[in-house]
Swiss-Prot record:
Key words of the record: Amino-acid biosynthesis, Arginine biosynthesis, Cytoplasm, Lyase
One GO molecular-function entry: argininosuccinate lyase activity
Name used for this protein in its record: Argininosuccinate lyase
EC number(s) recorded for this UniProt protein: 4.3.2.1
Enzyme superclass (EC): lyase
Entry keyword Lyase: yes
Name of the coding gene: argH
Domain of life: Archaea
Pathway: Amino-acid biosynthesis; L-arginine biosynthesis; L-arginine from L-ornithine and carbamoyl phosphate: step 3/3
Record field: catalytic activity: 2-(N(omega)-L-arginino)succinate = fumarate + L-arginine
Pfam families: ASL_C2, Lyase_1
Subcellular location: Cytoplasm
Cellular component GO terms held in the UniProt record: cytosol
Protein family (similarity comment): Belongs to the lyase 1 family. Argininosuccinate lyase subfamily.
Amino acid sequence: MNILRRGRLGSNVKEDVMKFTTSLEFDKEIFESDILCDIAHTTMLVEQNVISEENGKKIIAELKKIAEQSMESLNLDPSLDDIHMVIESELIKELGEDVAGRMHTGRSRNDEVATDLRLSLRKKVLEIITHLIAMEKNMLRVSREHKETLTVGYTHLQQAQPVTFGHHILSHVSAIERDISRFFDTYNRINISPLGCGAMATTGFNLNRKRTQELLGFYDLIENSMDGVSSRDFVVETMANISMLGTNLSKICEELVVFSSAEFNTIEIANEYTSTSSIMPQKKNPDVAEITRAKLSTLNGELVTVLTIMKALPNTYNRDLQEISPHLWKSVYTLIDSIQMVDGMISTVKVNKERMKENAEKNYSTATELADTLVRECGIAFRMAHGIVGELVKRSIEEKVEIKEIILEVLEKNNLSLSQEKIDTALDPFENVKLRNVIGGPAPKEVERAISSFNEKISSHKEKLDEKIAEIESVKKNLLK
């Protein structure tokens, strides 16, 4: 029986109510964090002379024994509500209530669970960043391999201008970079301590909140006790980051599906990320990209669900907040799995260079550079050049002739002239690419510079990541030693 009920409520509780309200199913995500929180709190209680050193040592020793077990080995009776009471009941069973019952002095489950969530989530955020860095490294490798692989870029899914496949890959790297930065920023807001806020008004015991902050490796305190127990904005912020990253990854999945189709035929997804048809033996379907795309879509739904749960809740703690947790952890694991799938598909993709080159050489992808050449060489306004080249394209389509066959005629009609060398250069897609050597352009030299710049950022990220991982590992080591 839940020891909390014996006073005010009595032992009579319906089984279906217990099963409906328990959080034990998803409390496995905070099991270790709860023990670390208990040890830190107990250590501080001893130091502040709130409980005796003898009792504190007994409690901490038993907590360390529990930490060595799996959560499943404990008595997960739904009547205990949650992992906090499971652990406390385990302590009482081993030490007796007069000793174990002192651990919760000056603390509520409200500030306890808020602390546990932050401890567990900060670790998962670093895991996400770890996977993103690994994926970014692989994307940069592919980009370098294809910094001179000519292809065509699209707007409105219509062929637009010549680029390189390496430059195209870097467009996704650039977005992933912002995602990594967002997670690092969010980490700083996750890693602040609500422990000591109590139920919602702190406590009359002489607690040292700064000490538990230090023991648990938090960067700062949430000072206001009401905000400390009720705030879940760090969850929403993390899930918003997850949703944004999921959107970026879904774009990659979409391209893998579209560009691997027979109509595009510019890439081929590795066999291990595809399946075939039960009836059509020729099929090679991009199932992993499709399933990943679908799973990433669910992240938006999880975010909206959490926002809806939180909307208009009374200050401060409400049990509604419990229902946020399963949506958070589902989002985290869906994202991590999806990153690994996208990473694998990009790392093993086969590139059809001939098909990419063929696409870049047709459908007037060099028209912009031809207009730019008229501006540079003839001194006319760009809008005028735009109209002249537009006329060239129209006649080429209608008369079924190449632009180079009619360009001199059109230029002469407009009292303009260009050398054949300038015309050939303007209409050559790879020359187009080489000309675009400005920052962020597709020229191979600029792509190489950008790759080097991104690698420097990765090194900086890795250094920061390793530092934070070491901080967390140090907390665990010191508390469980």
